[in-house]
């Protein structure tokens, strides 16, 4: 189990953004950054400006973006903006920096949305930012997100994750971080799990994959061992069937389950992700699960078990997180990790943007939307 010497919660969107940019601007040796996608907007361009400037002053810059994620985000961009981003990536490369796109090894994985979904940023200063945020306006001026700034030996685990995703890690960079971590008093317990299904599924990729995802299994274990309460945030709550069964088991034995996810209005480009989630509302509500929908978007990935164990990272409660995307989650019982998450759930519960889903939710919908749910709910795995 890795330990941290410091953990700073980054729920406030401006605070996380300022910390990310400050890390790049203050870097003296290297910066590593991974993201699901980077948007052609004020935030994406500002980060590319900072990375390019760092590389030009001699900092070793390594940027990892998911191919599928960038393609998905690119659907919302104009052809001109997509081309402009490619030029910016080439500029960083021309200065000696690394810009990589994670691509799964098998055709079926690539075809069906396999990729990496892990967001890590670290530098030689000995700090890493880890959590749910992409480098986009949505993450910093739209949705709720949760990241943490970490110091200590746990950073080496994050560096190992980047290497597992295909990032070339300079051995000198690893030694530099190890030296800093060893010099700091690390007493904050961290349980860290990482899994990439693309290195375990067969030639059909996620189709009919019977394998076990260690992060999914961990979430199931936490639900099965919960005694009083489990509070969850997810972009859209549409867990794989094994995880859904664990949620229902816990609720039926009296565990208070509260789910906070996004309202259909939070993703104006499509309602299909929400429809996939809505397909499970009936059985969740009948089991006693409380569901809240955030109108401006809930993109954090938090779990609070029995008010004493906080879990955070990149894992959405969805099929893709189980069988298509590499994901990572951290957990801790240390009050420094738990108290900020307690406060977040208290804030969410009382926030006017969070609308509770009532038992009569379906009949209150417009007829056209009800018909779309009936038509498309069967395709949940694909959405």
Language-model segments: which ranges?
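Charged, low-complexity intrinsically disordered terminal segments
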Residues: 1-383
């Amino acid at each position: 189990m890795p330990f941290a010497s410091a953990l700073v919660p980054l729920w406030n969107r401006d605070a996380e953004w300022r910390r990310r940019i400050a890390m790049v601007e203050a870097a003296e040796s290297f910066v590593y950054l991974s993201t699901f996608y980077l948007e052609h907007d004020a935030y994406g361009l500002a980060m590319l400006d900072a990375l390019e400037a760092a590389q030009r002053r001699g900092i070793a810059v390594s940027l990892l973006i998911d191919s599928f994620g960038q393609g998905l985000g690119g659907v919302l961009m104009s052809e001109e903006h997509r081309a402009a981003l490619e030029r910016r990536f080439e500029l960083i490369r021309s200065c000696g920096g690394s810009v990589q796109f994670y691509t799964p090894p098998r055709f079926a994985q690539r075809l069906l949305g396999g990729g990496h979904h892990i967001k890590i940023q670290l530098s030689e200063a000995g700090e890493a930012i880890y959590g749910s945020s992409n480098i986009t306006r949505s993450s910093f001026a739209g949705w709720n997100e949760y990241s943490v700034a970490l110091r200590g030996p746990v950073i080496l685990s994050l560096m190992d994750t980047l290497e597992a995703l295909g990032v070339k890690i300079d051995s000198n960079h690893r030694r530099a971080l190890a030296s800093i971590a060893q010099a700091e008093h690390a007493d904050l317990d961290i349980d860290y799990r990482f899994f990439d299904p693309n290195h375990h599924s067969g030639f059909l990729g996620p189709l009919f994959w019977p394998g076990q995802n260690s992060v999914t299994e961990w979430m199931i274990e936490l639900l099965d061992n919960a005694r009083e309460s489990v509070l969850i945030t997810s972009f859209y709550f549409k867990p794989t069937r094994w995880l859904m069964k664990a949620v229902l088991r816990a609720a039926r034995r009296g565990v208070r389950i509260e789910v906070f996810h996004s309202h259909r209005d939070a993703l104006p480009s499509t309602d299909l992700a929400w429809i996939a989630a809505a397909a499970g509302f009936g059985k969740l509500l009948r089991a006693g699960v409380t569901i809240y929908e955030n109108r401006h978007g809930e993109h954090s990935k938090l779990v609070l078990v029995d008010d004493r164990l906080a879990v955070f990272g990149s894992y959405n409660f969805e099929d893709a997180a189980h069988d298509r995307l590499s994901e990572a989650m951290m957990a801790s019982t240390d009050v420094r990790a738990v108290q900020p998450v307690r406060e977040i759930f208290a804030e969410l519960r009382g926030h006017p943007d969070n609308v509770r889903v009532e038992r009569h939710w379906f009949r209150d919908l417009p007829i056209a939307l009800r018909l779309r749910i009936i038509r498309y709910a069967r395709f949940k795995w694909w959405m």
